[in-house]
């Protein structure tokens, strides 16, 4: 049992359940959007005694669990002490179910973020929570935000510059903390490579290649694109 658990246990009446909120995901890396989900969830559910952030192990585009934890630790400077960061080797969704199973007397509030107007997010939520009815002590709490920052966008921004990354980070961060986050993220994110094709094209003509290849740019007579 953690120190937070001991303190909460002493404050709760004997017959009152503890409410533990869980926010689980990959967070590769954590963004402004993830941070706002936590803040908003705490505001919308003042009965939360403890909020656990489960950080998944799976690496994404060079960003590791350790890097994600380091970034969250910076964000935690602006979150209450009831927030606890937990790296997990178990897939995040399974970790939520495991916690509920192992703590049947605890009321578990499963925090899930969704971007306003993003139908894909709501479909994803339905897929991820299809087994939730098997756990009587889990209640879903979908937190809808207007921020569209994603881990993918942050990874791509970090490949370009700190200036591109900054708008995807919490406004609360000091300048030196923005630098710290950028340094953490860029460590394993390689910059986009310029790939040449043998196609000979007209000078300064911008083209788009059908299929998955990004918009192309010309250098001299050789087609190049960022991949």
Please provide the spans of the model-predicted regions.
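Nucleotidyltransferase catalytic core that binds NTPs
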Residues: 2-227
